[in-house]
Design a protein with these regions (language model features):
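N-terminal leader/targeting segments and the immediately adjacent pre-domain N-terminus
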Residues: 14, 19, 41-154, 182, ...
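Bacterial N-terminal signal peptides
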Residues: 29-39
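Active-site-proximal loop and beta-strand segments within enzyme catalytic domains
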Residues: 113-129, 143, 154-156, 176-258
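Active-site SXXK
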Residues: 142, 160-185, 209, 268-272, ...
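Active-site helix/loop module of the DD-peptidase/beta-lactamase fold
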Residues: 160, 179-217, 249, 274-312, ...
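Active-site-proximal alpha-helical segments within enzyme catalytic domains
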Residues: 170, 264-271, 312-334, 395-411
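Active-site-proximal binding-pocket segments
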Residues: 284-285, 290-354
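Active-site Gly/Thr loop motif
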Residues: 295-298, 353-406
Length: 441
């Protein structure tokens, strides 16, 4: 049979074939568009300082904390921290992913987000050109609206949380409280962590540790000479409990003043291990990470005793950070599986993230010149409940529960404090601009 001799098919069959072809073409084009969007098509900032010519090298552990302090290795180290040998003289504790990952569909096209920075009107690509962002995700109603990577980073790579991990630790406290493993937030830490008995932190309540209001004299500047370095050196020689012994001066009565101190999150990890009999990773794997629907395993750096350094040092993919943000945005429930109920107790989560449920000293403009502080979480000014998980060098997860909006921002900023560069201001304007796309801030 020659080409001209093909039989005529029924119209219904040919129409079905045409529809299937159109669907396949549309799917392929959408996939191609997202593949292009994932890859930087703009001039990436500061590639020389970040050592692109050396393939974004990975730093090393040791006294100099090369992996953390050296700008040249920041991109490589912040996407391989879980694998660097010798950090805290320990290894990484792993949380296995879920059998059924949370569904994260992608929008057919990106919204045209625009916002003002001074006299300039910016879009997403403009922001990426201006800031050292390794990954940026915007998720609305459980659907990815924007996903960008630069500096040769990929969706499959784990990114370092820095202090965003503190909120994860706080959520573990809430789960343990609901289970009765922690009887009261007003119990002293030493009730659950006998190794802290007699120390300043041991005599501080769990609630005051959650709010970073122990009253301890503690300066955190990330210069290798501050109280964080002094605490870290003692902890490396032994454990977090040994680190607690060098923090001895209480400048203010507990509960009265917010003072940022990463050591207080490590104390919560000790409390949780004593209360649950498990490491933080083992406890959260079956209670949060897998129920949440994580797609990829996570790594959490631990010391020589197996205790996670809970104030940071957590490593996960950008999409799994987005899933965590969605869990928080939906008040502890999984948006694609509401039948699972509360994974994080809603009442506790709302208390942790609502500035109105904390004393005035922890309110926005009081705790800091802009942010307020809840339970290991930063709260925004305004009537609407909005909050963020923040980490040094530009890490952030923005959460707007009312709009079911999450933004993941993973970066390699030039300075530990984003506010010391243009990133601090411009990231806030990005958040406000995206929120403004959907309604008033």
């Amino acid at each position: 049979m020659g080409p001209v001799d093909l039989p005529l098919l029924p119209r219904a069959v040919t129409m079905a074939a045409e529809v299937n072809t159109m669907k396949l073409t549309r799917t392929l084009l959408l996939g191609l568009a997202w593949a292009v969007a994932l890859t930087a098509a703009w001039a990436e900032p500061d590639t020389q300082a970040l050592c692109k010519d050396r393939g974004y090298p990975i730093g090393e552990a040791g006294r100099a904390n090369n992996w953390f302090m050296n700008e040249c290795v920041r991109v490589g180290s912040f996407t391989h921290q879980g694998e660097i040998v010798g950090i805290f003289n320990g290894r990484s504790n792993e949380m296995q992913p879920a059998a059924e990952p949370m569904v994260l569909n992608k929008a057919e096209r990106e919204p045209d987000y625009r916002w003002w920075v001074g006299s300039e009107r910016l879009r997403i690509d403009d922001y990426m050109k201006r800031q050292r962002v390794m990954a940026l995700l915007i998720v609305k109603d459980g659907v990815i609206q924007v996903e960008r990577y630069q500096y040769d980073r990929k969706p499959t790579q784990r990114f370092l949380s820095n202090s965003m991990a503190k909120t994860l630790t706080a959520m573990a406290v809430g789960i343990a409280l609901k289970e009765g493993r922690i009887r009261s937030l007003d119990d002293r830490a030493e009730v659950y962590a006998p190794a802290l008995t007699g120390t300043l932190y041991g005599q501080t309540s769990v609630r005051h540790l959650l709010r970073m209001s122990s009253g301890a004299k503690f300066e955190e500047r990330y210069d290798g000479k501050d109280d964080l370095a002094r605490y870290g050196a003692a902890a490396r020689q032994g454990s977090a409990a040994d680190g607690a012994k060098v923090i001895t001066e209480r400048r203010h009565p507990a509960g009265e003043v917010f003072n940022y101190a990463s050591a207080e999150t490590d104390m919560l990890a000790l409390v949780l291990r004593g209360a649950t009999g498990q490491t933080l990773s083992a406890y959260l794997q079956t209670r949060l990470w897998q129920p949440m629907g994580a797609q990829t395993s996570s790594l959490w750096r631990a010391d020589s005793t197996g205790l996670e350094r809970a104030g940071g040092n957590f490593n996960a993919t950008a999409r799994d950070y987005a899933r965590l943000g969605l869990l928080l945005a939906y008040d502890g429930q999984r948006p694609d599986r509401p039948d699972l109920g509360e994974i994080i107790p809603a009442a506790y989560l709302i208390e942790a993230t609502d500035s109105k449920q904390h004393p005035p000293a922890f309110a926005p403009y009081k705790a800091t010149p802009y942010f307020g502080y809840g339970y290991q979480t930063w709260t925004f000014p305004g009537q609407q409940r909005r909050f963020a998980l923040l980490g040094v060098y530009g890490q952030a997860i923005f959460v707007d529960p009312a709009r079911k909006l999450v933004m993941v921002h993973l970066a390699a900023n030039a300075t530990a404090s984003a506010g010391q560069t243009s990133m601090g201001r411009e990231r806030t304007l990005l958040w406000q601009g995206v929120v403004g796309h959907y309604g008033p801030w």
